[in-house]
Amino acid sequence: MDSYQEEEPVASTSGLQDLQTLSELVGPENAGEGDLVIAEEPEENPRRPRRYTKRDVKCVSYHAYKELEDKHPHHIKLQDWIPKPEEMVAQKVQNQDVGTILSFDVTCLKSITSLGRNDPGNDPSIMSHVLPVVTPWPMSQDHYAPTLFGLLDRYYKGYLENPATFQTWKFTCQEDPSGKRYMGTQFWVPPLGQVNIQFYKNYQIVTCCQALDPFANIFHGTEEEMYDIDSGPDVWCTPSLCFKVIYEGAIGQKQEQKSWLCRLGYGHRMGANDYRRVDLYAMKQGKKNPYGDKGDAALQYAYQVKRGCKAGCLASPVLNFKALQFHRTLMADLTNPKIGQGYLAHGYHAAMEAYGPQRGSSEERVWWNATRNQGKKDEYYREGGEEPHYPNTPAPHKKTWEERHKVLKLSPFATPSDIQRWTTRALPYGWKVIDGNGDDYTSRRNIRTLTEMTQEEIRKRWERGYCDPFIDSGSDSDGPLSKPQTVKVW
């Protein structure tokens, strides 16, 4: 198992001595201990093209949510929901070091990934702005503010639907197992799960347990059976879904922050293991079911996505890569949420297809080792061995995953957007799919003739696996002149 002892020692960062300056913009002239300093822009060289400087790439993720606040002056404000610096001073909030924070979950800590574009290493996932973990909307790995604003945005939408059971985040002063004081709160955000936020003077910590869901993942057995992993709910705490992200810096820091992604396993703190069956039923009391009928994106994520990504037998770099593929597919649709936005995507079918097999596959493992994405020493499967019920070895005489999933089959939880996309991709032009409600979806597939195709399109046909770019699929039904047919999906 990956543990924090295997990581390079991290220097302790004591925060600002005077928290009164936390709300000010930190610059080279007034930066305190523990703050990141923005480098000054170098002078322009007229003989060379201008390159991006540190000032250009900094503050990108922080302003992702600031732009939203400026566009909606009467909307919610993040600073109205998080503790004020003066309040943290009054409560005597203390500094903490990252090694001590990691030690709290050492028994359930599956891996630690140091994130940041300036972080040394050969893991490409650390270079992204998106936090490499499967979530309903993308979170930021560069700054805590967009991540919290996305959570607040989604939480506030639930408040508008059912104001009697929602309230402002209540931050209270608490002590961690080492005795250090911090400001913390926790709340449940569907379909994500249970969220816990901690503010130290020099760190912000967000812990998320996606296995905690009293509406979509509750177990109806006995109290003893509930804590048995062999007979528990469908989704238990797994390193592919449960995580803790640690942001380094003061609460008022505007610059890009250093962060660590910790993947948590079964039995982690602030997770589903801390809740008894009676607690889950109590969480449902007085709350409106946040999930709609089949076709609702929230229901699709709570049931299909979590059950399709729960296996934790793969190594952390592989899970990071698959999670980024998941978010990349979602963000390719510009109408889906971006960093700093907390609404749901139109559908997660395409993202699940991009995520691939949750337990891995032979061809994916061969590709991973052949491309050497993580170097020769890094493995495809988790170093700590197999997780329960998630074997590393594929069944013998079984077709490869690619052969069985040329087009990922439709799920009963697919949204209308997913059905339309699947119909256009899987069925000939003019064919229809009719769902249980009587709504029909017509395939828009169109095959262009050779005279209309460019050299770039011909090359792409080669890359997609066509043996000859000048030959169609061999079916007369792949064009506008085909005879439409209807397929019923119930």
UniProtKB/Swiss-Prot annotation:
Swiss-Prot/TrEMBL GO biological process terms: positive regulation of DNA-templated transcription; viral process
Pfam families attached to this UniProt entry: Foamy_BEL (PF03274)
Region described as Disordered: spans on this chain: 1-20, 25-52, 471-490
A GO cellular-component term linked to this record: host cell nucleus
Record carries keyword Secreted: yes
Bias type Polar residues, positions: 11-20
Alphabetical keyword list: Host cytoplasm, Host nucleus, Host-virus interaction, Secreted
Keyword Membrane: no
Organism domain of life: Viruses
Record's function text: Bet counteracts the innate antiretroviral activity of APOBEC3 family defense factors by inhibiting their incorporation into virions. May be implicated in the establishment and/or maintenance of viral persistance. Bet is required for viral replication.
Quaternary context: Bet interacts with host APOBEC3C; this interaction does not induce APOBEC3C degradation, but prevents dimerization and incorporation into virion of the latter.
This protein's name: Protein Bet
Lineage: Viruses, Riboviria, Pararnavirae, Artverviricota, Revtraviricetes
Gene of this entry: bet
